[in-house]
C-alpha cells in the first residue's frame, strides 16, 4: 500500500531516494555509455522494488532484473514499462503471463527451452528469452565449461524453437568480488568463455541483440569488459552497489551511500539494580545500576538475534547503546545509562546512523554479507521513502493485506 499519511512508529525502514539516485549515477559514470540493467530482485534487496525501480527508470535505466515472475508482475502493476528480465526459473505453465506482460525470461537448458516453447505455442505467442550461459557459476545455464560445443548446440536448438524469441545472452560472475590471483584468473576465464559463446552464436547466424555479464563488482572493476564484444550490444547489471554497499570487503569503492536506515522507538525505560536480569536465558545480569530501554523491534523484523548480549550497537540521541541480553522476537533491550535525556517514544537507530551499526558491520558480526542483512528486513516493517528530507511515500504490507 502506497501512502503518504503518518504511519505507526513501531519499527520502520527509511529509504533515502537521494542516495539511491547518487548510487545509480555513480555506476553510470563508471559504466560510461553502457546501458544499465538495475537489479531489483528480492524487493530491491529489501528496499521496495516498485519505488526503487521508478527512480532507476527516471535516471535512465535500460532494463530491470528480477528473480521470479511474481516480482516482474509486481513491477508491471506498479506502472513500470521498462523491459524486465527474470533471472531465474519460471514454470512453463506461466508462458501466457510472460507474453501478456512483455517479460523476458532466462533460458538455461534444452529441456526448459522445449517446455517453455511448447507452452508459448499453446498460448498463441512467443516468449522472449535471454540465453543463460554457465561459465563457472555452476547454478543454472548452458554448461560451457563442461562441453562447450554441446552447450552451443543446445543454445542454437533453443533459438530455433517456434515458441521462443532469443533476444539476449548473459552470464554471472562467481568471484568478481575477490581480487586474489586465482579468482582474478577464474573471472577472466569466465569472461573468455562468454565472449567465445557470443561469437559461436554469431557465426551460426544467431547473434544476440543484447549481451550482459557485469555484476556490481564487474562493472566497477572492469568497465572495459565489453572487450571482445560489440559494445553497442552490451549492458551492465549492477545490484548491491545501487543500494549503497560494496560487493565485498576485498572490493571497495568508497563512492556509494547506504540507502536504508532501520529505526524503532523506545517503549519503556527502567532502572535495573545489581543482580537483576534481562531477557530470555538470563544472559544479562546487571553488575551495577543500569538504565535499560526496551525497543519495539526484534528478530521477526529482521534485527539479527546473533547481535544479542552486547554484539549489536543501537544509536539513541547520538550515543552508541549496546544490546543487553538476548534479542527477542518483537522486542529487545539496550543500555541507555549514558543517555540521560532518553524518553519513551524516542527514536532509536538500529542501523544506518552515525554511531550505530551498519548493514556491513552487522554482516561482519553475524558472519554473513550485507545482502542478507538488507533482504532480511521483514514485510511487517513499513518502508518510508524520503526525498530531500521529506516523506514522499509509505509502503505498508500489513495494511495492504
Regions found by a protein language model. Give the residues of each.
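A charged N-terminal "starter" segment
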Residues: 1-104, 110, 118, 126, ...
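Active-site loop/helix belt of alpha/beta enzymes
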Residues: 8, 42-59, 77, 114-119, ...
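Residue-level signal for inorganic ion chemistry
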Residues: 20, 75, 169, 266, ...
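Hydrophobic "anchor" residues on beta-strands that sit immediately upstream
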Residues: 37, 128-130, 168, 322
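Fold-independent oxyanion-binding glycine-rich loops
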Residues: 40-42, 68-69, 89, 108-110, ...
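Small-residue-enriched segments and motifs
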Residues: 264-266, 321-322
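C-terminal accessory subdomain/extension
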Residues: 271-401
Amino acid at each position: 500500500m502506497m501512502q503518504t499519511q503518518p504511519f505507526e512508529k513501531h519499527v520502520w525502514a527509511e529509504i533515502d531516494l537521494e542516495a539511491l539516485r547518487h548510487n545509480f549515477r555513480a555506476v553510470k559514470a563508471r559504466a560510461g555509455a553502457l546501458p544499465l540493467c538495475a537489479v531489483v530482485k528480492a524487493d530491491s534487496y529489501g528496499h521496495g522494488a516498485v519505488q526503487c525501480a521508478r527512480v532507476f527508470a527516471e535516471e535512465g535505466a535500460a532494463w530491470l532484473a528480477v528473480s521470479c515472475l511474481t516480482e516482474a508482475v509486481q513491477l508491471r502493476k506498479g506502472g513500470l514499462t521498462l523491459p524486465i528480465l527474470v533471472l531465474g526459473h519460471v514454470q512453463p505453465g506461466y508462458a501466457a503471463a510472460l507474453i501478456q506482460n512483455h517479460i523476458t525470461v532466462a533460458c538455461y537448458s534444452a529441456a526448459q527451452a522445449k517446455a517453455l516453447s511448447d507452452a508459448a505455442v499453446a498460448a498463441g505467442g512467443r516468449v522472449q528469452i535471454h540465453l543463460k550461459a554457465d561459465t563457472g557459476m555452476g547454478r543454472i545455464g548452458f554448461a560451457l565449461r563442461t562441453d562447450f560445443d554441446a552447450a552451443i548446440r543446445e543454445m542454437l536448438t533453443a533459438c530455433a524453437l517456434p515458441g521462443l524469441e532469443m533476444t539476449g545472452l548473459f552470464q554471472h560472475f562467481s568471484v568478481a568480488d575477490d581480487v586474489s590471483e586465482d579468482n582474478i584468473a577464474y573471472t577472466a576465464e569466465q569472461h573468455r568463455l562468454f565472449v567465445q559463446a557470443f561469437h559461436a552464436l554469431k557465426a551460426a547466424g544467431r547473434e544476440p541483440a543484447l549481451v550482459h555479464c557485469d555484476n556490481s563488482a564487474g562493472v566497477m572493476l572492469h568497465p572495459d569488459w565489453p572487450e571482445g564484444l560489440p559494445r553497442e550490444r552490451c549492458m551492465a547489471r549492477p545490484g548491491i552497489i545501487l543500494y549503497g554497499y560494496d560487493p565485498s570487503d576485498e572490493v571497495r569503492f568508497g563512492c556509494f551511500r547506504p540507502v536504508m536506515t532501520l529505526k524503532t522507538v523506545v517503549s519503556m525505560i527502567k532502572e535495573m539494580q545489581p543482580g537483576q536480569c534481562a531477557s530470555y536465558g538470563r544472559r544479562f545480569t546487571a553488575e551495577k545500576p543500569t538504565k535499560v530501554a526496551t525497543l519495539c523491534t526484534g528478530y521477526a523484523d529482521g534485527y539479527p538475534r546473533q547481535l544479542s548480549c552486547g554484539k549489536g550497537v543501537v544509536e539513541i540521541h547520538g550515543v552508541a547503546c549496546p544490546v543487553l541480553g538476548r534479542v527477542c522476537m518483537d522486542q529487545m533491550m539496550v543500555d541507555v545509562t549514558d543517555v540521560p535525556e532518553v524518553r519513551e517514544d524516542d527514536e532509536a537507530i538500529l542501523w544506518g546512523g552515525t554511531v550505530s551499526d551498519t548493514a556491513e558491520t552487522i554482516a561482519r558480526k553475524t558472519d554473513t554479507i550485507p545482502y542478507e542483512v538488507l533482504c532480511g528486513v521483514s514485510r511487517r516493517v513499513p518502508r518510508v521513502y524520503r526525498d530531500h528530507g521529506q516523506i514522499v511515500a509509505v509502503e505498508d504490507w500489513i495494511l495492504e493485506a
